Curated annotation (Swiss-Prot):
Alphabetically ordered keywords of this record: Endonuclease, Hydrolase, Intron homing, Membrane, Mitochondrion, Nuclease, Transmembrane, Transmembrane helix
PTM comment, free text: The mature protein may arise from proteolytic cleavage of an in-frame translation of COX1 exons 1 and 2 plus intron 2, containing the aI2 open reading frame.
COX1 intron 2 encoded: annotated span: 129-533
Family assignment from sequence similarity: In the C-terminal section; belongs to the LAGLIDADG endonuclease family. In the N-terminal section; belongs to the heme-copper respiratory oxidase family.
Pfam short name (any one): COX1
EC annotation from Swiss-Prot or TrEMBL: 3.1.-.-
Species whose genome carries this gene: Mycosarcoma maydis
Name of the protein: Probable intron-encoded endonuclease aI2
């Protein structure tokens, strides 16, 4: 025992490394078997739907096989024992360090295995690389086969060692899994074109294997592509959502408040009589079809309803819930608990009364028809204010009044529906960041938003708006909305926010490119052949 614990003989330690590598290999094989058993057939097999556990098993398997099997065997075993024997070399220097380095491995393996079964851990899965474990993974640059082929043709005439190495590094460093989160539906393609290189016209990638200094200017081509994915009802921690794992009271509350905010902006409570004399009811949220990802997120969180694009030329998509029982069971409780803050509360109140009348078995069909027709004939009163503001006597005089009614989750949702992050021209050579939310009605809502975000309400001829280009206010807005939004507004915000601190020479040209980029992104529409519902 003393020999194995305290030996500084390279052959003894090499033997220990080889034994340890065999032991680690058996553990890694067990993880591998678990993974393959889970993937052997469709659906959930043995882990009972625990995606968090599945992710950490994958990561633990990789770590064990590489760092505790391959490296100890090749470096510790062969390096300490077999290589010196083969070449007739003496034992290594620093023999005590050689001993210590081995005995640090067993506790490391134990800690790794223990962490693999911590249910609330990070669950890094395929996103072990720190860059990929951040929210920016949604926008990770990736090259598809067409781009790689095209760039290969451009490089062909002047292909050399430098360009080949850069080309290979691009593939290894930038081609990553785009659906890591399980909800990633958007991919960014990026090509950086360098200048100041005499021996090559185009380099693909951001890594340079050269002795020369390469100066680049960020002419970036971005394409946002919709990628159909399946959503998990209980997403794993790896997804790193604003609402985390989709479990727990706080997450549910945040989502519901956010949904009410989205509905206050782009939602509709609709009921009408069909040609057949039947009353139909629907709760729906409309978005530009380039933001269809947001609608699928709502559908996955609620677990009911459908997303449809009636015709791609309309440039709109809708999330709808038409089933009366689903509306009563899932939709009404949300809006009763977290009331609408805009005048849409009036329509919701009529909608709720109508649907409860329709579901009342004690009424005859004629009575139902008369009562619902009366509700349908009602119109919105002038200067209507949602009852949610009764708590502050329909007056917002301080930020405390505003925050007692309007939550951050609601404001995030409302901003995704009605807000705008953009860049505006302030002079011949001056572009600045701007933020704006506008409304035709509901002045009290804009007053509350203005107090929370520390900006002012401006009254126009036909509408009211909260808008600012003030440097300090924009800083506060960037901080307030950091890592919060779910739809394509998150992409617009990210590009807008990351360009805010650009200073010095070339700022105007840089801001012009960002402005054009944001306009191009907003102009993206679904392919004309898209018919998914």
């Amino acid at each position: 025992m003393v020999r194995w614990l305290y030996s500084t003989n390279a052959k003894d330690i090499g033997t220990l490394y080889l034994i340890f590598a065999v032991f680690a290999a058996m553990i890694g094989t067990a993880f591998s078997v678990l993974i393959r058993m889970e993937l052997a057939a469709p659906g959930v097999q043995y882990l009972n739907g625990d995606h968090q556990l599945y992710n950490v098993i994958i990561t633990a398997h990789a770590f064990v096989m590489i760092f505790f099997m391959v490296m100890p065997a090749m470096v510790g075993g062969f390096g300490n024992y077999l290589v010196p024997v083969m070449i007739g070399a003496p034992d290594m220097a620093f023999p005590r360090l050689n001993n210590i380095s081995f005995w640090l491995l067993p506790p490391s393996l134990i800690l790794l295995l223990a962490s693999a079964f911590v249910e609330q851990g990070a669950g890094t899965g395929w996103t072990v690389k720190c860059k990929l474990s951040q929210i920016i993974i949604m926008f990770v640059s990736i090259y598809n086969l067409l781009n790689i082929t095209r760039c290969g043709k451009l490089l062909y005439s002047e292909m050399n060692t430098h360009s080949v190495l850069t080309y290979i590094s691009t593939m290894f460093n930038d081609v990553k899994m785009s659906s890591t989160w399980g909800q990633s539906a958007w991919i960014l393609y990026k090509i950086i074109i360098p200048r100041g290189i005499t021996y090559i016209k185009l380099v693909v990638g951001v890594l340079s294997y050269t002795m020369y200094k390469v100066y680049t200017y960020s002419i970036s081509l971005f394409y946002v592509v919709y990628n159909s994915v399946s959503f998990n009802k209980n997403p794993s921690e790896t997804q790193r959502n604003v609402f985390s794992s989709g479990r727990g009271v706080n997450n549910s509350t945040n989502f519901k408040e956010w949904l009410v905010g989205i509905t206050d902006g782009d939602g509709t409570f609709y009921f009408a009589k069909t040609k057949k004399g039947i009353w139909s009811f629907s709760f729906q949220i409309g978005q530009s079809n380039y933001n269809i990802r947001l609608l699928y997120y709502i559908k996955s969180m609620l677990g009911i309803g459908s997303v449809s694009v009636t015709h791609a030329k309309d440039n709109t998509a809708h999330y709808r819930v038409r089933n009366i029982q689903h509306i009563i069971q899932y939709i009404l409780p949300i809006f009763d608990t977290y009331p609408l803050l805009t005048s849409k509360y009036f329509n919701y109140d009529l909608f709720k009364k109508a649907i409860l009348i329709m579901n009342d078995s004690s009424l005859s069909n004629q009575e139902k028809d008369e009562k619902i027709s009366y509700l349908k004939s009602q119109s919105l009163p002038d200067n209507y204010i949602s009852p949610a503001w009764n708590n502050v006597n329909n007056q917002v005089t301080s930020i405390l009044d505003a925050m007692s009614v309007m939550t951050k989750s609601w404001l995030i949702g409302f901003t995704e529906a009605e807000g705008s992050f953009y860049i505006v021209k302030k002079g011949p050579l001056r572009l600045v960041h701007a933020f704006e939310i506008s409304q035709k009605l509901d002045h009290i809502v804009l007053e509350a938003i203005a107090l929370i975000l520390d900006i002012k309400v401006t009254t126009k001829k036909t509408y009211m708006t909260v808008v600012t280009t003030n440097y300090k206010s924009i800083e506060n807005i960037i901080s307030y909305f950091f890592k919060t939004m779910k739809g394509m507004k998150a992409l617009e915000y990210r590009i807008w926010a990351r360009s805010f601190n650009k200073k010095g020479s070339g700022r105007f040209e840089y801001m012009t490119k960002i402005q054009n980029l944001m306009r191009n992104i907003r102009s993206i529409r679904l392919d004309k052949n898209f018919t998914k519902k």
